[in-house]
Amino acid sequence: AGRVFAVTIDNQTHALDSETGEKLWFHAGLAEVASLLGAASPAGQAGNVVTAYSSGELVALRVENGRALWADNLSNVRRIDALSSIADIRGKPVIDRGVVYAISHSGRMVAIDLRSGGRIWERPIAGVETPWVAGDFIYVLTVDSQILCLTRDSGRVRWVTQLPHFVNEEKNKYPIIWTGPVLVSDRLVVGGSHGLAMTISPYTGELLGMQPMPAGVSIPPIVAGETLYFLSDNAR
């Protein structure tokens, strides 16, 4: 039977029968007092499901019985302020060719071997959006409004593009919250809470253009067929 996996706000992963809704098993992570709004969906491959919690825990579980294969923690030991101490993994873990890529809010991005749980590389990068893996590169949006291109095998930074922090940069007014990126037709696309979408070259990081939206965008766009869909904050 098929399975549906869901993560609750109190850091539990539940496996349900897709036909009957019967609970098959659950896994409990560490409780966390403070977390960001929203949660990461689990990612599955090769009979395993990788789940992420607001505590910074990243756990690989067997699909059939929920047995833990390995666990890691993406919380940062260097906590500069109260906000940076939130270790939440809100971006969905990505599994590509047997490697798990994940990023936490507190400043740790990792590549982990799915089978063994061993870290392949680690970088001090903080983010709350899902990384996008394409070929030999990974694209990620940071909490500092930067788009980074990293090499898939070593995590080496190839280029960095700074996005605007504020609508009014001179007076630091009206902060912009970005979401994405999504790669489509040789373009990286990000959406902003100020009602603009930006396209960026995946090869150089060069800003290619902007597209007005009906309103702000809070969730990443999706690609279906040859069409890119946005959902704006005014439900258009």
Model region roles, listed by residue range:
Residues 137-152, 156-199:
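Loop/turn-rich, solvent-exposed surfaces of beta-rich toroidal or solenoidal domains
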